[in-house]
Amino acid sequence: MVNTLRVMLWDEEIGRLAWDDRRRLSYFTYNPEFLKKGIDVSPLQAPVRGIRAMTPVWGEDAKMYQKLPAFLADSLPDAWGNQLFELWRIQNHIPNADITPLDKLSFIGKRGMGALEFLPEVTKADKAEMIDVKSLADLAERIFIERENAHIMPEESITMQSLLTVGTSAGGRQPKAIIAINKTTGEVRSGQVAGLQDYDYYILKFGDTKYSSAEIEMTYYEMAIKSGIDMMPSRLYEIDGNRNFITKRFDRDGERKLHTQTLAAISPETDSYEGLVAVCRKLHLPETDCQEVFRRLVFNVLSNNTDDHTKNFSFVMDEAGLWRLSPAYDLTYIIDTGGYLPNTGHCMYVRSKLHHISYDDAILFAKDNGIRRADAIIREVADSLRQFRDIAKRYAVQDRWISSIESAINTHLVSWGLEDKDNSSSFEIDGKSCTDVRIEQAYKGNFHLYASIDGRACKFIIGKNKPEYATIQETGLSNLPETMLR
């Protein structure tokens, strides 16, 4: 059990983190020598100026911070990293009752996102060993499915050690690894060791073929770039025939680490896009960053990226202490628990709303927050989203997902008055009046054909075993001709 950690930034100790066993809470105290530099690593929560800098910074009670000060909790492993940590704990016969958040930070050591490091570290990445990415992907998939019940075979111990090294620090639920790829040969090594010549550092997100997850995220990446959103270069990366999504790290500038804080860390109380803009201004960011927040808001709503929680927005600080909004990341389509329909609830508020955010809400948001060219930005984003089908086809997204996502995007565009197309039709068959004829996807994946026939509401189920089902998927709900509805 670790009771005290040295917290390092760019080879300098910025302070000590200790564990109060009686209060079951951690506290951080600044190194007086570091305070003299005046570099604010947490300007809103733990400023280095004034009386607050001389008093302990106690941990947060909210679950996501695990009893740590918010600006240090960012370095903790997320859901996927915790799965790997649990396996490591079990393999090393460490009782769960003996584990504190400081143990987890010690386990992360120098491998965390951003530039903060924690000493002493339990596991070290002293050499940039070559990685068998095929074995890494196979083991990651098994652990993700079996969780703590996964049994690691003796012959897999080296792969497991590699996965612990490259996989525990990346955030999020999805299995990930931090890798470095040689620019010339394509050779893959651990991305946790600095100083590799002619290598680029990436986050590798293992794809899920059932959900076309890598292909969909790549499609969203391209649409975001076309929308004018700032993102790191990304691409698909094939491993044994399966495609995965890789993106360059924004917390690295060549061999140097950049200090990084998520919105959750830098301002724990913020839960809205209005609050995010306010944080940008408190950090004295340029107005282009505030405009970027608005552009992402519009993209997230219209593209149904509802996983817009406070850990999916970040800020980076250089060694001069200057802050900027980080490039966007984790932009993708979010489905509901049924596995087919779009999830409708956002994580961050827009004008006190998580659902049914409208064009008027966006325009008023821009007016209230001093964002210029709001309508032009909205239309730029809409133009990029109209290209979804063509881009998704190019990246071989499965037809069922193209149909579902295209329908969700079209619904949002129509509700914002950006698309005139109405997917319903009216006609007469054999003397019967058929009005408001339309097809919608149901919760468990079937399609429902709705119509009002001579004033009577009717519903017909098109199951997955029907020949029309595949045709609807291939054509897309937004593109069904009237002849097919007839």
Language model features: what each stretch is:
Residues 427, 435, 448-453, 457-460, ...:
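Short linear proline/tyrosine/threonine-rich motifs used for host-factor recruitment
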Residues 421, 479-486:
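Non-Sec secretion/translocation targeting segments of pathogen effectors
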Residues 1-3, 445-449:
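Short, hydrophobic/aromatic-rich segments at coil-to-beta transitions
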Residues 15, 434, 439, 445-446:
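Accessory DNA-engaging acidic/polar modules
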Residues 1-310, 314-423:
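Phosphate/dinucleotide-binding and metal-coordinating scaffold of catalytic cores
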